[in-house]
Amino acid sequence: MASIAQAAKSLLLKEFASAFALSMRQFFAPKATLNYPHEKGPVSPRFRGEHALRRYPNGEERCIACKLCEAICPAQAITIEAGPRRNDGTRRTVRYDIDMVKCIYCGFCQEACPVDAIVEGPNFEFATETREELYYDKDKLLANGDRWEREIARNIAMDAPYR
């Protein structure tokens, strides 16, 4: 009797039919992947992407040249030169450079900044063709801040209860 059952299974190709049914279910199921360059997935508010220097709403840069980000950077990727003190006692940076080749995107600079001047924004598409383009100066960082300010402010506001 066992040989008849085995012959029936082989003749009716039960394993083949069940495997084919499984394949067809997966074929018509929704796709789990994205067509990346054309479709982009959601990014976490805590995502650490391209660096940016922020400005106050009046247009003045936030960085007060305290150099805490330079001191805490484990990769020593940040270089800051502070300008002379102003009449009101504040000072600003003359030079603010980040070597993105050295940067390990740890976020320590963002955590150390007392005025939220340096942040890691939501941009993850900043590949370049040359190394020189990965040396960010103050102008490039401020341009990034201007470009991504709305998203950066939203992400900081969402993360505020946990800071």
From Swiss-Prot:
Major localization class: membrane
One example of a Gene Ontology biological process annotation: aerobic respiration
InterPro entries: 4Fe4S_Fe-S-bd (IPR017896), 4Fe4S_Fe_S_CS (IPR017900), NADH_quinone_OxRdtase_chainI (IPR010226)
Record field: catalytic activity: a quinone + NADH + 5 H(+)(in) = a quinol + NAD(+) + 4 H(+)(out)
Keyword Metal-binding in record: yes
GO MF: 4 iron, 4 sulfur cluster binding; iron ion binding; NADH:ubiquinone reductase (non-electrogenic) activity; quinone binding
Family designation: Belongs to the complex I 23 kDa subunit family.
Name used for this protein in its record: NADH-quinone oxidoreductase subunit I
Source species of the chain: Brucella abortus (strain 2308)
